[in-house]
């Protein structure tokens, strides 16, 4: 009997901590989202879901929702595509490999805010490094306002998002590649397999669990990413680069709509929970089959 109850006693402190740190704030968030709230954060009467209705009736929220989906898919997908070949190269035995790994990982150690500040300066339309380089190469005659135009601001932010996500994703894939036995590659080489065949038949299938981990973690990380969008453009021009997390910030701290901001938080939480559960189930079934 004691052996059966011991595991529950061991995990009890963690459950209590999770209840205090996670579950209670979510319950309080739901309470705020379903009530009218004044600018001082005081709850008024129950509004029967009016905050959620108001959100879906506004074009700003719907545009931010769609843009968040584009932002997440593009950044996560782009980081995966770049990180796999980078990890494969860094996993090879060559002179200076340790230095190359450190260089790749360094951006991960820099805060997102500092990275966003650097890129905001580099993409400045008047004195930015990118325009100066393009002028020097003779590729442009007039300055390009990278962050002042909706057509270029959001794509550049996606590019920055990919670049800052690659180091973490590469680290995950390096861990996966190091677990693949070298004997498999040696045997396939003796049988005349090309590098592409080795990747398709050995590397990628054995790397799939790590790909799944990277997709789930990066989706959560990128979906909630605030500094890149906010520091570079604050959602400008005309809210054309807003995603859900920056839209939430504006609702709460610029417009004082704490009820609607809380509703956005709950919607974001629900989206991530549904995605994570569905993706883990699909990936688990595919591995079992």
UniProtKB/Swiss-Prot annotation:
Cross-referenced Gene3D superfamilies: MetI-like
UniProt membrane topology term: Multi-pass membrane protein
Transmembrane segments: 9-29, 70-90, 99-119, 144-166, 213-233, 258-278
Domain of life according to the entry: Bacteria
Record-linked PROSITE patterns: ABC_TM1
UniProt cross-references to InterPro entries, sorted A to Z: MetI-like (IPR000515), MetI-like_sf (IPR035906)
GO cellular component entries: plasma membrane
Subcellular location as annotated: Cell inner membrane
Domain ABC transmembrane type-1: 65-279
Disulfide bonds: none
Main location group: membrane
Alphabetical keyword list: Cell inner membrane, Cell membrane, Membrane, Transmembrane, Transmembrane helix, Transport
GO BP terms, alphabetized: transmembrane transport
Annotated function: Probably part of an ABC transporter complex. Probably responsible for the translocation of the substrate across the membrane.
Family affiliation: Belongs to the binding-protein-dependent transport system permease family.
Subunit-level organization: The complex is composed of two ATP-binding proteins (BAB2_0493), two transmembrane proteins (BAB2_0490) and a solute-binding protein (BAB2_0491).
Protein's UniProt name: Probable ABC transporter permease protein BAB2_0490
């Amino acid at each position: 009997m004691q052996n059966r109850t011991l595991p529950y006693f061991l995990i009890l402190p963690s459950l209590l901590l999770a209840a205090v740190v996670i579950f209670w704030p979510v319950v309080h968030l739901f309470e705020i989202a379903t009530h009218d709230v004044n600018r001082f954060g005081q709850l008024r009467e129950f509004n029967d879901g009016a905050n959620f209705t108001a959100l879906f009736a506004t074009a700003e929220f719907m545009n931010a929702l769609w843009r968040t989906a584009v932002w997440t898919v593009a950044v996560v997908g782009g980081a995966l595509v770049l990180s796999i070949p980078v990890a494969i190269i860094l996993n090879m035995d060559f002179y200076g490999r340790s230095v190359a790994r450190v260089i790749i990982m360094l951006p991960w150690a820099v805060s997102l805010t500092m990275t966003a500040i650097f890129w905001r300066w580099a993409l400045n339309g008047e004195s930015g490094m990118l325009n100066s380089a393009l002028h020097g190469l003779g590729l442009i005659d007039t300055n390009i306002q990278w962050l002042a135009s909706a057509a270029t601001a959001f794509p550049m932010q996606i590019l920055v998002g990919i670049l800052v996500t690659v180091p973490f994703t590469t680290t995950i894939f390096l861990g996966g590649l190091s677990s693949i036995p070298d004997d498999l590659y040696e045997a396939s080489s003796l049988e005349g397999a090309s590098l592409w065949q080795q990747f398709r038949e050995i590397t990628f299938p054995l790397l799939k669990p790590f790909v799944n981990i990277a997709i789930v973690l990066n989706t959560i990380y990128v979906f909630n990413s605030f500094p890149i969008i906010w520091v570079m453009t604050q959602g400008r021009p005309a809210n054309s680069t807003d995603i859900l997390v920056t839209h939430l910030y504006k609702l709460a701290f610029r417009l004082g709509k704490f009820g609607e901001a809380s509703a956005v938080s709950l919607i974001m939480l629900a989206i991530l929970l549904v995605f994570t559960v569905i993706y883990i189930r699909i990936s688990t079934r595919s591995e079992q089959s």
